[in-house]
C-alpha cells in the first residue's frame, strides 16, 4: 500500500516537472546553436547594443547643444567684440583657365574655425561631435562668399560635402568642398610669352569688420595645394595667401582674404602651332626670288598661297583670344611675318614691271634692226612672256622704211660675208639680252640676301624683348 502511494506521487511530480525540464533543455540547445552557427552574429548584435550611443545618450543633440534655447540668427557675442573666424584652404585642383572668358575654375576644401559658447556641452571624455549638413541650417555659420565669382557650388555626391565638428568648449569647425569659377583680369600684351596673376577673394557678405574678423588660421601656412597639381598650358609658379580690407560706401569696411597664384604659360605649344608655321611661310615666300622672272604663274601662285596661309594663321589665333584693344606679342610676330610675305609679292611685281618697261625700250630701239635681219619682234616678245600679239600695235607703215633710207641702211649694215653677218647678229642679241638680264635680276639678287638678314634681325630683337 505504501509502495503504491509512493509510485503515484513520483509519477505526479514527474508530470509537473517535465515541461520545465524540456524548456531548460530547449534553452540549452538554443544556446548551443547560437554558440555554434550564429556565434559571430550574436557578438555583433551585442557589440552594437553596447556602442549605440544614440540610445545610450539620454537627450537629443538639439537639447545637448541648446539649439532650442538660443537664437542662432544672431552671431556669437552679439553687441560685443567681433567674432574671429579663421580660414584655411586646401586647393585640390585648378580645373581650367579660359583666356576668352578671362576666368578660372578651382576646386578646394574651405574650412572655417570659430567659437560659439552657445554650442558648448559637458563631456567627460572631452570628445567632439561630428555632424553633416543638416545641423548647419539650425546654428549660426559665417556667411563667406567669393568676390568676382561667376559660378560656384558645393559638391553633393553622394551627399552634400559639408562637415561640422563641435567641441565641448564651443569651438566649431565647418569644412566644405567647393568648386568656384571666378574672374581673372589678364593682360595679354605679352601673349603667349606672358605670366598671369590671378586671385580668389573671400569676404563676409553681411558682417563688416565691427561684427566679424576674418583671418588666415595658420598665417601663410593656411593655404595648401596638391603636390602634383599641373595644367596643360600653364606652369604654376607660386601660391600665396594674403589679406586686406574692402570698403563699401553704404556698409563700411570688410575683411577680405586673397588666394593668389601665378601662372606662366608653356610657350612650346605656341611655337609648334603658331610661330613655326609662320616662319615656314616666310621662308617659302623667299623661294620666289630663285624662280625665273618669266615664270609668271609660278611666282604669282606661290605669293598668293603664302599670303592666304598667313591670313589663316592670324585668324585662327585671333579666334581663340578675347577681342582686346591692344597688340599682343603674337600679333606683332604674325603681322611682321605677313609683311615679309606681302613684300615678296610686291618684289616680283616690281621686277615684272621694270622688266616690261626695259623690254619696251629695247623693242623701240631694235625694232627696225630686227626687221632688217628678218626677226619678228612680235614673236620675240611673246616668247619672252611679257607681251602678246594683241598688245602690240604693229603698224606696217611705221615699220616700213622708205627706199632711200632702206638703201642707205642696207649699204651701212649689210655684211660683206655670211660669217660677219652672223657675228654681228650675235653681238647685237647678246648686248640687248645682257641689258635685260642685268636690269631684271638686280632686285632678285639683293632680295635673296636682304630679306633673310632683316628677318633674322627681327627675330633676335623680338625674342630678346619678350623673353
Curated annotation (Swiss-Prot):
Source organism: Homo sapiens (Human)
Sections of the chain in a coiled coil: none
Cystine bridges: 184-198
Chemical reaction(s) catalysed: chloride(in) = chloride(out)
Extracellular-facing ranges: 25-266, 321-331
GO biological process, one term: chloride transmembrane transport
Record's bilayer topology term: Multi-pass membrane protein
Matching InterPro entries: GABAA/Glycine_rcpt, Neur_chan_lig-bd, Neur_chan_lig-bd_sf, Neur_channel, Neuro-gated_channel_TM_sf, Neuro_actylchol_rec, Neurotrans-gated_channel_TM, Neurotransmitter_ion_chnl_CS
Membrane-spanning parts: 267-287, 300-320, 332-352, 447-467
UniProt keyword annotations, A-Z: Cell membrane, Chloride, Chloride channel, Disulfide bond, Glycoprotein, Ion channel, Ion transport, Membrane, Postsynaptic cell membrane, Signal, Synapse, Transmembrane, Transmembrane helix, Transport
Stored NCBIfam families: LIC
Signal peptide boundaries: 1-24
Name by which UniProt lists this protein: Gamma-aminobutyric acid receptor subunit rho-3
Amino acid at each position: 500500500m505504501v509502495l503504491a502511494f509512493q509510485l503515484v506521487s513520483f509519477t505526479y511530480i514527474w508530470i509537473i516537472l517535465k515541461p520545465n525540464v524540456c524548456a531548460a533543455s530547449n534553452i540549452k540547445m538554443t544556446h548551443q546553436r547560437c554558440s555554434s552557427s550564429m556565434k559571430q552574429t550574436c557578438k555583433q548584435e551585442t557589440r552594437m547594443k553596447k556602442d549605440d550611443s544614440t540610445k545610450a545618450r539620454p537627450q537629443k543633440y538639439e537639447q545637448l547643444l541648446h539649439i532650442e534655447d538660443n537664437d542662432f540668427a544672431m552671431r556669437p557675442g552679439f553687441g560685443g567684440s567681433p567674432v574671429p573666424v579663421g580660414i584655411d584652404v586646401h586647393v585640390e585642383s585648378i580645373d581650367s583657365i579660359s583666356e576668352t572668358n578671362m576666368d578660372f575654375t578651382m576646386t578646394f576644401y574651405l574650412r572655417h574655425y570659430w567659437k560659439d559658447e552657445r554650442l558648448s556641452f559637458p563631456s567627460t571624455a572631452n570628445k567632439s561631435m561630428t555632424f553633416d549638413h543638416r545641423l548647419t541650417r539650425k546654428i549660426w555659420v559665417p556667411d563667406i562668399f567669393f568676390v568676382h565669382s561667376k559660378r560656384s557650388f558645393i559638391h553633393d555626391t553622394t551627399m552634400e560635402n559639408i562637415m561640422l565638428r563641435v567641441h565641448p568648449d564651443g569651438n566649431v569647425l565647418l569644412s566644405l568642398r567647393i568648386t568656384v569659377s571666378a574672374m581673372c583680369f589678364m593682360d595679354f600684351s605679352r601673349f603667349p610669352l606672358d605670366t598671369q596673376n590671378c586671385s580668389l577673394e573671400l569676404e563676409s557678405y553681411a558682417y563688416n569688420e565691427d561684427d566679424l574678423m576674418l583671418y588666415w588660421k595658420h598665417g601663410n601656412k593656411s593655404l595648401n595645394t596638391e603636390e602634383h597639381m599641373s595644367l596643360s598650358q600653364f606652369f604654376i609658379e607660386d601660391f600665396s595667401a594674403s589679406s586686406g580690407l574692402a570698403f563699401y560706401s553704404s556698409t563700411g569696411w570688410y575683411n577680405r582674404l586673397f588666394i593668389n597664384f601665378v601662372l606662366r604659360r608653356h610657350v612650346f605649344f605656341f611655337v609648334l602651332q603658331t610661330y613655326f608655321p609662320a616662319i615656314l611661310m616666310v621662308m617659302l615666300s623667299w623661294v620666289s626670288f630663285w624662280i625665273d622672272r618669266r615664270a609668271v604663274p609660278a611666282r604669282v601662285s606661290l605669293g598668293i598661297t603664302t599670303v592666304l596661309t598667313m591670313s589663316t594663321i592670324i585668324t585662327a589665333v585671333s579666334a581663340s583670344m578675347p577681342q582686346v584693344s591692344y597688340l599682343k606679342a603674337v600679333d606683332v610676330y604674325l603681322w611682321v611675318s605677313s609683311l615679309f610675305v606681302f613684300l615678296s609679292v610686291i618684289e616680283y611685281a616690281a621686277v615684272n614691271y621694270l622688266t616690261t618697261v626695259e623690254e619696251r625700250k629695247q623693242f623701240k630701239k631694235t625694232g627696225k634692226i630686227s626687221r632688217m635681219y628678218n626677226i619678228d619682234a612680235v614673236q620675240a616678245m611673246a616668247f619672252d612672256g611679257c607681251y602678246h600679239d594683241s598688245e602690240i600695235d604693229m603698224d606696217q607703215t611705221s615699220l616700213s622704211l622708205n627706199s632711200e633710207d632702206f638703201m642707205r641702211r642696207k649699204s651701212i649694215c649689210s655684211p660683206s660675208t655670211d660669217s660677219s653677218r652672223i657675228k654681228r647678229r650675235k653681238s647685237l642679241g647678246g648686248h640687248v639680252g645682257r641689258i635685260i638680264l642685268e636690269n631684271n635680276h638686280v632686285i632678285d639678287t639683293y632680295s635673296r640676301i636682304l630679306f633673310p638678314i632683316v628677318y633674322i634681325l627681327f627675330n633676335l630683337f623680338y625674342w630678346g624683348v619678350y623673353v
